Amino acid sequence: MDERYDPKKIEGKWQAHWDAAGLFKVKEDPSKEKYFLMEMFPYPSGKIHMGHVRNYSIGDVVARFKRMQGFNVLHPMGWDAFGMPAENAAIKNNTHPAKWTYENIAAMGAQLKAMGFSYDWDREIATCKPDYYRWEQWLFVQMFKKGMVYRKEASVNWCHTCQTVLANEQVEQNMCWRCGDEVEQKKLKQWFFRITDYADDLLEHCDKLPGWPEKVVTMQKNWIGKSHGAEILFSVKDSDVKIKVFTTRPDTLCGATFMCLAPEHPLVEDLSKGTAQEAVVQEFVARMAKQDKAKRTADDKEKEGVPIGAQCINPLTGKTMEIYTANFALMEYGTGAVMSVPTHDQRDFEFATKYGLEKIVVIQPEGEALSPETMTEAYTDPGVLVNSGQFDGMKNTDAMEAIAQYLDENDMGKKTVQYRIRDWGISRQRYWGAPIPMIHCPDCGITPVPEDQLPVILPEDANLLEGGKSPLPELDSFVKTTCPQCGNENARRETDTMDTFVESSWYPERYCSPKCDDGMFDVDAVKYWMPVDQYIGGVEHAVMHLLYSRYFTRVLNDFGLVDFKEPFTRLLTQGMVCKETLKCPEHGWLFPHEVEGSGDERTCTKCGKIVEAGRVEKMSKSKLNVVDPEELLAKYGADTIRLFCLFAAPPERDLDWSEEGVEGSYRFLQRVWRMFAAHMDEVKDAQPFEGSPDDLDGYLKDLYKKTHQTIKKVTEDIDGRFHFNTAISAVMELVNMVYGLDDNLQGEKRAGVLRAAVEAVILLISPMTPHFTEELWSLFGKTQCVLETPWPAWREDALTADEVVVVLQVNGKLRSKLNVPLDTDDEKIKEMALADEKVQKFMGGKPIRKVIVVKNKLVNVVV
């Protein structure tokens, strides 16, 4: 064998071997236990980045480990290929999104294969292919027929210059990311999925996801946002109009002194029309339409509003309340109307203080009298009702129910439940997406495309190079069609395309039978493989993608296509890959290769000025703190990159990039290679020792025990815990112990014990460094791949130590340690402890009150 490990010589060879042998291809096998592992599929941007490498390295370790444990492992890969990034890149590069996307898929696929990831490429999917989105359209039609889809007018981000709708992500400081012009709110007809019909079920099952991170479950619950409260009707003064308000605090109703409507609330325009406030209200509403809603309603944002020129009546007190439109009220929460109780809600308190509005205390803490004049903040804790008429003296928690019941009995309101979640608007006025399969007929109205005419194929002869709006409405060859119901030849196709979250909501099921051409998927295949046993991806998808996937699975369940409700049994959200930023005072952000020197003396290669090192943060193209996986691959090989990504940090934490760490991983592989080479001749023809540790003594016994202890440690660290860093550390310790074997220590069992240790090292790191270990395994003369070799098992009788470390304390404080034989007699160990020099020093000659011995753990001398 070569003296040094050279990844260039071996990685391509083993990738070709795996491919030729079809080792990653799987099919349903009822005789084997299945394991379905997925990482979130990527958008085909053109090149993989280190975030991809880390994500897929984590998944590949688990996939290879489970295969070696005997599971039938499905580990697929595909492409989230529709969406605005491809469309925008195509416009920028004067090409077509389809060409751009498929070229990127080919390039990134080659990069992933070069990393040695064990994907079943026969199951590759791309969501932009008609054979994929055909079935998405089919399901849309079924949902439409069942009333699960509807169309209504809704507010969207609109860029007048580009004549297009923008997703929230495309709005930066309320400016269009493309042209820089202001974005406004515009009402357009949009298609919606009735996800709110499933809100309770989605929420209830959040507590039935034990394999999910608690923070993700909490985020899902908060997004669904179930609130118990009351719906209260406020009559508008001198009008028949009633304003419906949802509140979780009906106990504070008597303290409501004004009302706030969201700027988007339809009554703002209606009630201000013809009043002296009309122009002021219009200006305020227009200004609010240009503000980001999340920032507008943030706790630290100054509260502001204007009266709309109308008043309403408090149904309990009969008092007149001024109606305002305010920046902190949102149409998306409750009813878009807020009964404002300044003494018991902090936002209302700040608003009332700013505009000099009345404050009435209606909840007092027991034994204390609050006064509006002296309050510096709202009182939001429990207490007793005051200034609340017949409800005075009640605990506020009891008054919630009593007031809600009173409102119900007097037709002023009712108890109800509200949700933060809203129906899912899936319309996108963009080109590069799955066409919505609906037809608009002048006579019949809206009708679905017949199933035998699916898919509605996205035309590729559209011109995207002029402006930014979708070309579909102007493309007669696409738009003009015949009504399938009445034959009217003036019918038009729907020109909106679907939100790309729709494609990613059912792709796990499609992986089970990606070539199925008579349905969304083969039902029996899905029954075998689903649900996904382990899903891996970024926490940035903790809400939308995962929630939509859970919703879609319930829809499929309702149609009888699947027999489960939750698509993902276990979820791992890996941390980001981070690196320090480097900035030149003259040239701005710099790539790492544009900096020379070290420490505080680093300089810009362009101008020689001292470079400012910023904080360590997520790798991003905008700040140039990126590392190109291809450059690393050429320098170190795939296995070193994989090993570093797995060793540098636990998977759920952020990984701080370190070139020294990569070098360290490379040195470790060289060290293992040298270890193998040094003992190759001795162990090549030996059989691994498999006997009892009692048949060994001295260092050989210790090495044999260490081998089995390491097998147990690595197995448990990988299986479920995903503690890859500590698993690798354990293997490093075993390697060190092999290096510590004295050449002069001979014996008939030496070669067998050494062979067992070396084999364990190879097998245990094989999921992390597959090419490297396949090469070493083959040098042993093995004809079967490592991946086809059973995962090693440990011997229970080899796990116990012959010696233990016993902690010595004086008055409960650690003072020394002893290495003693396991299960040493209590009297003997007490004698050894009292004779220890450090223990005697800290006893200071004081009389001993007692000596506590915990066998094999500690001795505490109390003086």
From Swiss-Prot:
Reactions catalysed: tRNA(Leu) + L-leucine + ATP = L-leucyl-tRNA(Leu) + AMP + diphosphate
Q: What is a single Pfam family found in this protein's UniProt entry?
A: Anticodon_1
Any one Gene Ontology molecular-function term assigned to this protein's record: leucine-tRNA ligase activity
* Residue span of motif 'HIGH' region: 42-52
For this chain's UniProt record, which GO biological process terms are given?
Answer: leucyl-tRNA aminoacylation
UniProt entry keywords in alphabetical sequence: Aminoacyl-tRNA synthetase, ATP-binding, Cytoplasm, Ligase, Nucleotide-binding, Protein biosynthesis
Q: Does the keyword rRNA-binding apply?
A: no
Location within or outside the cell: Cytoplasm
Might you report a single GO cellular component term?
cytosol
What InterPro entries does this protein's entry cite? Answer: aa-tRNA-synth_I_CS (IPR001412), aa-tRNA-synth_Ia (IPR002300), Leu-tRNA-ligase (IPR002302), Leu_tRNA-synth_edit (IPR025709), M/V/L/I-tRNA-synth_anticd-bd (IPR013155), Rossmann-like_a/b/a_fold (IPR014729), tRNAsynth_Ia_anticodon-bd (IPR009080), Val/Leu/Ile-tRNA-synth_edit (IPR009008)
* Source species, domain of life: Bacteria
Q: Where is this motif: 'KMSKS' region?
A: 618-622
EC number(s) in its UniProt entry? 6.1.1.4
* Class of the enzyme per the UniProt entry, highest EC level: ligase
Main site of residence?
A: cytoplasm
Give residues annotated as binding ATP: 621
Instruction: Give the record's family classification.
Output: Belongs to the class-I aminoacyl-tRNA synthetase family.
HAMAP family per record:
Leu_tRNA_synth_B
Q: What is this protein called?
A: Leucine--tRNA ligase
The protein's organism comes out as Desulfatibacillum aliphaticivorans
Q: Gene name on record?
A: leuS
